[in-house]
Amino acid sequence: MDDRMRLGAVLVFFTALFFWGNAALPVTAPVEVNYAQTAKEMLAAGNYLSPQIYGNYWYDKPIFFYWELIAAFSVFGVTDFAARFFPALFASAGLLLTYALARRLYDARTAFWSVVILGSCVLYGFLAKLILTDLTLFVFFGGTLGAFCLGYREGRRGYFYLAYACAGLGVLTKGPVGFLLPGLVILVYLVVRRDLRALGRIALPTGLLVLAAVCAPWYVYMYLAHGADFVNTFLGIHNVLRATVSEHAQWNVWYFYLGIYFLGMFPWSFALPLALLRAWRTRPVLDAGTQFLLVWAIVVPVFFQLMATKYPTYSFPAFLPTAILTAHLLRRNTRVLSAGALLGGALYLAVVFGAVHYAPRDGHFSGKAAAELLMQTMQEDDLLVSCGDYTATVPYYTGHPMYALATREEIAARAPKAMSWNSKNVMPFLPLDELPQDRTVYLVVERHAFATFDETLAGGRWELLGTMPTEGREKLRVYRRVP
C-alpha cells in the first residue's frame, strides 16, 4: 500500500470515528449547551453577528464558532448531530494539517505516524465530539504557526500572509490569544535561534493588515453596536479576569498541564519523554524545524500555567507539535508505534461505544430526557422553573423559557456583576415568593437541591412526573403543580 492509500485509509477511519454516534449524544450542560443555545437563538432571530442567550446579548466568545453552529443548524436542523458536526469536521482537518506540516518538515513516514498518534490520543478524540471551540482554534493556531515555520525555512512571503490570515481566524474564534500566543511562540523561537532580525522579513506591517482585514470588521461592529458593555465583558471578564483571577481555584496547581499532557496524550504520554531522553544523551544537532516544534510544544503550556485560570483544553494547541515530535523520534520503532496505535484505537472505540449507549440514559450532564418528559404535557403558557444547578439543556430541548428559582438573597448574590464570574449567570431568575399559585408550574430539581426541595417546597401539592436516569442514582426530578 503506497503512502497516499495508507493516509487515506487512516483519515477515513478517524473521520468515521469522529462522526460515529454523534446523533445519539445529547447536548450537555453546563458548557456545550451555552454554545448550542446561543446559535439556536441567533438563527431563530435572524441575528448573525451579536451572540445572544436567553434573550440577552452576551460576549463569552467571538463569533466564528457560532457561525459554524448556525451553518450546521441551517443544513441539518437543530439536532445533536448538527451541533457536533463542525468539531468532528475540524478534527479531521487538524489531522490533514498535521500531516502536511510533518511531511514538509520530515518525510511521509513521520507524517503518517504523526496523524496516527494525534488521532488516537485521548484528548483529541474526546474534543472531536464536544461542542467546544477548541478544535477550531487548534486548526487556526496550527495553521498560523505551521505557515510561519514553512515561510521561515523557505523564505516565501506567501506563507507569512497565510499565517496572519489564520491568526485572524483564531482571533475570531477565541479572542486575542489567537494572535498573541502564536506571536509569543514565534518570538521565543527567534530568540532561541538568535535571529531577531527575522522580524524584518516576516511581512509585519502588511501582515497585520491582513490579520485586521479578517477579524477587525466583526470587532468594530460589536463595539459600535454594544459599546463599553462588549469591551468590559469580553475583554475585561473573559480575557483579563481569566488571566488574573482563577475561575477554578482547585485546578490552580503547578503540575496542572503536566497532568493534562499525560492524560490527554495517552497512550503516547511516555513515548515522547523517553525518546527525548534518549536523544539528549546523543546530543544531536537539532534542525530549525525540530527546534520550532519544541518551542511550540513548551511555550503553550508554560504560558497557560502562568495564567490564573486553568482549563483542561487550554494547552491543546501544543498537541500538534508533540505528535509530530513523537513520530519523528519513534519513526524507526515500528513495534512501539503499532502497539500505541492499537491501544489508542481500541480505547477510543470503547469510550465512544459506552458514551453513545450511556449518555441518552443519563440525567445529569444532559436534561434531554427530562425535556422529552416535559414536552408530553407542558403547554405554551405553563411556567417552567428549576431548583439547584441550572440544567440549561432543558430549555434548549423544550424551547420553553426556564427560570432559576431562588430566594431574593440568593438571586442578589448570583446576579451578574462587573469583573466577576457572576457575569456568566445570564439565565432568567424567579424569586421563590413570586411563584404563582394560579398557574400550572413544572419544576426541574437537580440532585444538589433535593434536600432544599424537601425542606421548602415538598408540601405544595407537587406531583412527581419522573426521575432521571430511570436506573441508578437519581440526578434530576421533574414535578408538576396545577392550580
Residue ranges and their predicted role:
Residues 67, 275, 393-396, 452-453:
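Phosphate- and divalent-cation-binding pockets in alpha/beta enzyme and binding domains
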Residues 313, 351-373:
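Hydrophobic alpha-helical transmembrane segments in integral membrane proteins
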Residues 366-389, 399-483:
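Luminal/periplasmic acceptor-recognition loop/helix of membrane-associated glycosyltransferases
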Residues 330-353:
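Signature aromatic-anchored transmembrane alpha helix within multi-pass, membrane-resident enzymes
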Residues 154-155, 247, 359-364, 418-424:
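Short, flexible loop segments at the rims of nucleotide/cofactor-binding pockets, characterized by
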Residues 259, 303, 318, 371-375, ...:
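Generic hydrophobic alpha-helical scaffold/packing signal
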Residues 1-336, 400, 474:
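Membrane-integral, polyisoprenol-dependent glycosyltransferases
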Residues 57, 390-391:
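Glycine- and aromatic-enriched periplasmic loops at the membrane-periplasm interface
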